[in-house]
Amino acid sequence: MGLIAGGLGQILILMDLPIILGCAIAIAFCIYLSGAYHEDGLADMADGFGAGGDGRRISNIIHDSRLGTYGVSALSLAIIVRILLVSSLVETGLWLFVIMGSGLAVGKGFVMINRRLFEVSEFAGTATVSFLGSNIRQIVCLLLWFLPCLFIFSLEQLALGIFLCVLVSLWCGFRAKFYLGGITGDILGATAFLTELAFFLGILLLA
């Protein structure tokens, strides 16, 4: 999805569309292709943790179809930051489809890592429980997602980007464990989104 959406945005940029606008269109198209799963998870997590309370109350808020002030604020800021980070990376000379493809790959990789590290909450749906899959498949997927990054970014950029991703993913996981007793699908979606931003930030800081 990142490659497709990023490819569209790259074409628009090559047609002299402003970089920030091309990136915004690419990100919007990526959200459409993915069904906004990660964005929904981030908004739900912000609503639940922002409102507070015991695990059941937070879970009810997370699974509520309504979007609250915390969710709107977090999602709006996150999308703005994502557009700014991606457009800034494009201005350094990187191709848009490379940036978006690698960012989504890293985010999904940390989703799998957190799914391994943390227990599943009693409030999680069946999709979260069945997400794990076999060990071999998970290892192959992680290699396919992470190895291309070695040929795109410098080792220093990767080290800082992955370090920031680790901090963010652990924060999401331990916060979910403290409030919900474990992770849920929404927490994993938020983890993917936030680690993607952390990865972009790490790459940009050493660009």
What is each residue range found by the language model?
Residues 1-35, 53, 64-65, 70-207:
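Hydrophobic alpha-helical transmembrane segments
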